[in-house]
A protein has these predicted regions:
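Surface/interface-facing alpha-helical segments and adjacent flexible terminal/loop regions used
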Residues: 1-193
Length: 193
């Protein structure tokens, strides 16, 4: 397999990890802009360019608004709250089967979640971070397993929740880009197995 393609996939997973983890946008702002700019310059679909351009514009012109939107959508457990646990979209509860599957894959990779990280292992930001790390460390079989068992069956519910949210603006573009990337990943695994 092409190492450049694997590296690009790891980078895009890292982008989504930063966008869906608490503090990720503030911590990784420059890298987020850089990756979105790269996607805009060399999009994997025409729509990817459109969504990455919208995201760059919003981040550069209203970063505080994006941070507020993240808090409202993913951290305030009332109103337009969007659950970011894969188990929620599978078992209709947090810390379910997908949490166990993710813990098993992380164990097989030799990863231990830090105690100071309060979110579950199956939160979409964490799933993207683990996917990125697995690809960087060339643990592609485990990354495919994580994709097949946890991400692929649950991500549509997470994306739909963002697209249907009346309070999401930036995260509608983010969810759309995530959906395009997941479609790319499905095709990638069909081609490379």
């Amino acid at each position: 397999m092409d190492n450049n393609l694997i590296g690009a996939r790891a980078t895009v997973y890292g982008l989504f990890a930063s966008l869906y983890m608490n503090g990720g946008i503030e911590r990784d702002y420059e890298a987020i802009i850089k990756v979105l700019s790269a996607i805009s310059s060399e999009p994997f679909t025409d729509e990817a360019k459109e969504f990455s351009d919208l995201m760059i514009d919003r981040l550069q012109n209203d970063k505080n608004g994006v941070l507020y939107e993240f808090e409202v959508l993913f951290n305030l457990p009332f109103g337009d709250f969007i659950n970011s646990s894969a188990s929620y979209y599978h078992d209709e509860r947090e810390f379910g089967e997908k949490t166990i599957s993710t813990k098993e894959i992380m164990h097989d990779a030799g990863y231990i979640k830090a105690d100071f990280y309060s979110s579950g292992e199956d939160e979409f930001g964490m799933l993207c971070a683990v996917s990125s790390k697995l690809l960087i460390e060339q643990k592609t079989i485990l990354q495919k397993k994580l994709f097949d068992i946890v991400l692929k069956p649950t991500v549509a519910g997470f994306v739909d929740a963002q697209l249907k949210s009346e309070r999401a603006e930036f995260y509608k573009s983010t969810a759309s880009l995530l959906a395009l990337f997941i479609a790319f990943e499905k095709s990638y695994f069909e081609f490379y197995g």
